[in-house]
């Protein structure tokens, strides 16, 4: 049955993945956003009604719920700073009042697993307070209390990812030994989509979690195994308060302190499924719930397949729910190291492309020959291929061709060449060249040349490798850009 659905938090991690799946299920979706421009690049933006509004303004909420059957409340304000818990409560009160007045038939809220009868962290206590406010609204409400959500872009998953990749050993405050029950984002979306059509007499809070109950330390080491990293030994610590831990997380990872602190606070408790009443309301997905390691594999699938573009946040919502989206936070996803150069030249795009396509082999790399030769020798000394392979053809390339210790991953003749490194490095590396027409300041026409070296480091060793080479990269890639452009200009003369 098609329903009219309002999604709050559509610019967020879960909302941005839920909205297109509700559309796919045949529902008519309205997305509420304070800044509708943030949804402009969403692949599904043309399939939904986007309305501007602020949940802290009751009149905005009343307009948003007009004519709606179901409200999905997916806004969490912990990244906003200040008294975010009070802001979340006010927003929930507005949603509850407006939904009741408008005759909304169902509210669905995504909260967090928490123990009963214990003093909770601010993060979990806020989730409980919001859920209770919505349950008391007089509108049939389902509160889904989820474990740690596993998928690229999820704040909890990104903290696991970055801590595991950066730390050679695992500091072990008490909460590293606490139990959690992670759940794959695909399974969270299964429950959310199904909740839109649950009979109206269903009302209450329901635990949802994956099939695995793990200590947080096991969660980090499970990620390490799936990411191809060594398991991290545990180093006991005498004391590490949530505040100190959040400072430390902020120092060694890109996860903002404002997000790290409430997440760490929630780890002070065992957060596991205590009842399975959800199975009587919404059956598990066909094939069963996804295990933790399987969820991590799904989250890393794009990166493992070599689809570097997804790591540059160009993935569309049509992909798997565990894939990254352009709307995910900038600190989410794999760490990407990059050296980018750009030049505008009077040479024609065709002339620049001819130089680019002939790179490597006997012509070399238009850079500092000594440094390039040293890199090739170093690769051979550790069992790599070095520079000895050359290239199949001196002037033409095709996908799959070898170019010294690179391989052509993608080529759009006349426009783009992307080479994937096959040298021995602690991570994965690419170099990409693009050429396009450009207007010169003098009024004539020429070409714009862009050059990017990209590195996805593996663990702390990969990061140290890149940082140690930054001075050499500055010389190598600066000279390369200058000489490629100069060669194209010389050819044109």
PLM regions and their residue ranges:
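SDR active-site strand-loop-helix element
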Residues: 8, 32, 74-75, 107-112, ...
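N-terminal Rossmann NAD(P)H-binding glycine-rich loop of SDR-like oxidoreductase domains
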Residues: 3-27
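Mid/C-terminal beta-alpha module of Rossmann-like enzyme folds, strongest
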Residues: 195-262, 270-341, 348
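Oxidoreductase cofactor-interface core, primarily capturing Rossmann-like NAD(P)-dependent enzymes
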Residues: 18, 25, 42, 117-227, ...
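Beta-strand/loop substructures that line and gate deep hydrophobic ligand-binding cavities in soluble
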Residues: 421-475
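Glycine-rich portal/gate segments that line the openings of hydrophobic small-molecule binding cavities
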Residues: 336, 344-353, 357-428, 439-442, ...
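NAD(P)H-binding glycine-rich loop region in Rossmannoid oxidoreductase-like domains
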Residues: 37-102, 112-117
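Conserved glycine-rich Rossmann-like NAD(P)H-binding loop of the short-chain dehydrogenase/reductase
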Residues: 27-34
